[in-house]
Amino acid sequence: MAAKGAHGTHLKVESEVERCRAEGQWDRMFELARHLQMLGISGGGSSNRRNSPSGRFTTLDTDDFVKLLLAEALLEQCLKDNHDKIKNSIPLLEKTDHRLNEAKDHLSSLLNNGKLPPQYMCEAMLILGKLHYVEGSYRDAVSMYARAGIDDISVENKPLYQMRLLSEAFVIKGLSLERLPNSVASHIRLTEREEEVVACFERASWVAQVFLQELEKTSNNSTSRHLKGSLSPDYELSYFLEAALQSAYVKNLKKGNIVKGMRELREILRTVETKATQNFKVVAAKHLAGVLLHSLSEDCYWSPLSHPLPEFMNKEENSFVTQTLRKPHLYEGDNLYCPKDNIEEALLLLLISESMATRDVVLSRAPEQAEDRKVSLQNASAIYDLLSITLGRRGQYVMLSECLERAMKCAFGEFHLWYQVALSMVACGKSAYAVSLLRECMKLQPSDPTVPLMAAKVCIGSLHWLEEAEHFATVVIGLGEEAGESLPKGYLALGLTYSLQATDATLKSKQDELHRKALQTLERARELAPDDPQIIFYVALQLALVRQISSAMERLQEALTMCRDDANALHLLALLFSAQKYYQHALDVINMAITEHPENFNLMFTKVKLEQVLKGPEEALVTCRQMLRLWQTLYNFSQLGGLEKDGSFEGLTVKKQNGIHLTLPDAHDADSGSRRASSIAASRLEEAMSELTLTTSVLKQGPMQLWTTLEQIWLQAAELFMEQRQLKEAGFCIQEAAGLFPTSHSVLYMRGRLAEVKGSFEEAKQLYKEALTVNPDGVRIMHSLGLMLSQLGHKSLAQKVLRDAVERQSTFHEAWQGLGEVLQDQGQNEAAVDCFLTALELEASSPVLPFSIIAREL
């Protein structure tokens, strides 16, 4: 019974030794080594145990086996304590760490005595090879592994810890070969060495994955047999196991072997994961996503289940064939998802990585976890950066903002994440939220001028929050020289804010003051950045707004020398020509600009006005047809792409709807149905368009600018039809616009114009009043209402409305003309003459469309 009990104890201790060596529990190894010495037995291998369980204890020298265990434990403890030095390839010195010296003495003694069986002698060589590497003796490490014959070692039916030793041996051999001096080696020998390095790394990766899968399987089985026992702690990867997992793909990618690097990464990600490899797989997925985004175009992509292009394979040399008997288990099945392009695969990888990274991120602010928190935040931030690139390339800014919002739980005090979220909100059109986020970014980095500058840009553009824009621009200017290149942009933002405030001001004195401040501020920006074409352009635009046409032309020519094809600059040039009454020159410039920017509707609206003045409404209606055709083309394109670009026509977010086609009405006589000779150009509109029209039941989806543009096209066509006295067709166009925005002030105003042309003055007056209620600052509405009131005999009220119009926009010459006519009817001839003279003066410098139609934005 005593012998049977001793035998059971021997088995238990031996199994515990193997388990601790596999799991890396090196502190426990010292206790087990002492236990073995007390028992006076050897720790025979599991293969011996299987073959001869009763005779293994007398064939081994206990002291030598204990030395082997102690040497490995001492070395592993030393490596764990010097992880950073090992990672940075800093050799460890025996004199600075006694454990290294003791381990080396034990191993040298074992190999010199040669009393251990071959299995343990081989293990001693593998451990000593690792020790040589950390000492910086790379040639000795390679020699020791050659002596151990690692290329011929099999992992079948071996203890788990031997698989770990073999995996580490392969990666260390590869690392040692990389670090050997190559000054005297031939080119052929260097190439062979490189191939051998890659082969070592590949084998190390395969063996490491098999080891970790088997280790977890063994641990799970052990836990299921001892349900009442405590769960074993998660396995912590050593430096060399981490290197074994990733060195193969890192080496291939560094050499430019994209195919092999991607193959390694994809195989790693397809292997059945373990707890120990979860974090590593996040890193691998991030690496593969980076390769897909930065090193592979969509034309060269191949899916995980297909083969790469032949030209890729021809460029990369053949590597050694890895003769691994066992392969790691892969995820397999009939319904596995397979990406179709590199963006799709990268997005899938990053979304998986993001879910894991945000789940495991360290949120604690405790000082002892500061380093872990820093590393986890860096990993999460890198993933979100790649997500920004991936989703940005597809224009999926809403999805990006949703992803980045999930990062806010770990973004406390992290400027980069806050700024990324803010930028994503800007891109997806959530401008007010973006400004709030940018305010927080300013608190985190108050000396960074780009943050308030971005906030000013958003406030000036989509929000029209001019007071806030003024504040943010002032913050940039307040940084002074610290703002660097952003300082001129700060003055530009402030100048544009003053200019927009002048446009919004209701008193002429306030308008003049703000225009003066805008011009002074913009000139200051030009002094700081004399070669910035954007600043010079806005100086020219500001001069045009205050009707300094000659000065504006000089500045604009200066800007055009730097940016000949800029759409806004060419647009302003055309408007300046039209203000000087050079309509043909203006039309030539607009046509040239449209050639360069065929999807710019602002240019086409100006072209319509120029053609209306120069050639009559017939030619202008042809351009309206082109605008409708362009709108429909962009709309159809948006159904296919579904890209998100707020406020842009380059990929509109509009869900597919069948049956949307646009056409202007047939220009027939309402009574006889015969075609008028004057309507030949207008009749050509329907020949290019479908018979179906945009019905009122269509749901408006996508950026509002898309639909307001369509509304303006219909209303512009209605105005042209009214000029030709084709009132039925004009009514049809207004009806189409009303189907989009029934209460729009533009629609109400045009309905009033149509009623006025028809002679329904009371109806026209009521519609003008409704339009003015919706848009109290509409000077054209005021002008038409004033004239209508005058025609109905309400002279005093007409005078008041027209005075409000000229006070609201002092450069509107038509309102001055109308006011003069009303004053003349009231017998105030002297005041009327002043109004007529002002109207003549302003008309001499009035463009076909107001200069303010050109966007003022950063």
From Swiss-Prot:
The chain residues annotated with the modification Phosphoserine are: 52, 183, 648, 678-679, 690
Keyword Repeat annotated: yes
Please give an example of a GO cellular component term from this record. plasma membrane
Q: Indicate where the modification Phosphothreonine is found in the sequence.
A: 693
Where does the record place it?
Cytoplasm; Cell membrane
Instruction: State one Pfam family annotation.
Output: TPR_8
The keyword Cytoplasm is assigned to this record? yes
Query: Which residue intervals correspond to the TPR repeats?
Result: 122-158, 415-448, 498-532, 533-566, 567-600, 745-778, 779-812, 813-846
GO terms for biological process, alphabetical: hemopoiesis; intracellular iron ion homeostasis; protein localization to plasma membrane
| Main subcellular location of this protein, as a coarse class | cytoplasm
Write the record's keywords in alphabetical order, separated by commas.
Answer: Cell membrane, Cytoplasm, Membrane, Phosphoprotein, Repeat, TPR repeat
Instruction: Describe the task this protein carries out.
Output: Component of a complex required to localize phosphatidylinositol 4-kinase (PI4K) to the plasma membrane. The complex acts as a regulator of phosphatidylinositol 4-phosphate (PtdIns(4)P) synthesis. In the complex, plays a central role in bridging PI4KA to EFR3B and HYCC1, via direct interactions.
Q: How does it assemble?
A: Component of a phosphatidylinositol 4-kinase (PI4K) complex, composed of PI4KA, EFR3 (EFR3A or EFR3B), TTC7 (TTC7A or TTC7B) and HYCC (HYCC1 or HYCC2). Interacts with PI4KA, interaction is direct. Interacts with EFR3 (EFR3A or EFR3B), interaction is direct. Interacts with HYCC (HYCC1 or HYCC2), interaction is direct. Association with the PI4K complex is strongly reduced by TMEM150A.
The molecule here is called Tetratricopeptide repeat protein 7A
Which organism is this protein's natural source?
Mus musculus
Per the record, the gene is Ttc7a
